[in-house]
Amino acid sequence: MIKLSKEKVLLLHQLIAEETGGSVGVRDIGLLESALNNAYATFGGEELYKTKEEKAASLGFSLISNHAFFDGNKRIGVYVMLTFLEAEVIKMNCTNEDVVDLGLSVAAGNMKYAEILKWINKFKK
């Protein structure tokens, strides 16, 4: 299973900001590291997020909720989640509107990890 590096996510954030507008910069590098590492957390030697879909949901939720960046947390959260799924050869059948709604719902506190996982499974091909 792949693991996106902090450096890769920082580059993606910069590219997204250049393409769509907004500020570039990390507000708290520890929150970014926490969001990226959470998907691979273990307890008693057991992975907390065992499947690729669970890891993707954790990445999306943590990146959006942690607000590690000054701007673009929703965009980077959904982009990293979808990039992870694509890298793991999990195809999604969702529209841009579906993705925007997901990001906004998570940021507003209306979707948590479990709902994101359901969303992934709903739109998975």
What do the predicted segments below correspond to?
Residues 1-125:
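FIC/Doc superfamily catalytic core
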